[in-house]
């Protein structure tokens, strides 16, 4: 069963992110423990081991800058962000004693299909769980905006769907929507997407000094999402703007997966 999970918004050479900050190297050297299979069923979503792993590592992530109109600089930037995500989530999965594997990253200039089907309407990119690949669109519209934190947040959201796949959350989601009525399907989709917003924002907090993004810039990003985040998703499968903003704030403030359990949250907070 394959699902294409989307968010709105060639391989480039990239420098390996530095792990100079102590928390990353110390965690990486932690005692090796036997991995366990990801949980199954509702527990995978509501009580996942990732929720008990504490804050994400304080990672130095050197990305460089995006030049307006430059596809090459955009690919380099996004590839470096992806490498930082790989390192950060590998550390977190080790703490959860869960197996980890990196996703594939594919840059495309047209709306290609995948094993999950056609490119979803309104999406600037998407993650396909069937082949564990992130498809990132490189278009003129994207390249007009050189503001790195926006693109890093987008990448981190798509990567969060891969995290959900590895952690067993995606499997629970797939089984649930397969049996659900239309309105219930949308509710499940919102919980999945809003969790990805939260996890992506937790990552952004831990690399904010390097991107950089200060509190004023972050607040501006959240306000924009609050006012506009729902406009690409008329069926409300990603949540209202205020819901997206709420979960982004939770992730950024806590920098921990524990803040991102949308599966036990009230219906009002995932509307």
Model-identified regions with their sequence ranges:
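Active-site scaffold of zinc-dependent metalloenzymes
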Residues: 115-149, 165
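Bacterial N-terminal signal peptides
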Residues: 1-7
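Post-HExxH zinc-binding segment in Zn-dependent metallohydrolases
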Residues: 182-209
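Short alpha-helix carrying the canonical HExxH Zn2+-binding catalytic motif
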Residues: 147-163
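Auxiliary, metal-adjacent structural segments of Zn-dependent hydrolase domains
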Residues: 76-131, 190
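Pan-zinc metallopeptidase signature
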Residues: 45-47, 51, 228-271
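Catalytic Zn2+-binding segment of zinc metalloproteases
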Residues: 159-175
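N-terminal low-complexity, Pro/Thr-rich disordered segments
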Residues: 8-71, 183
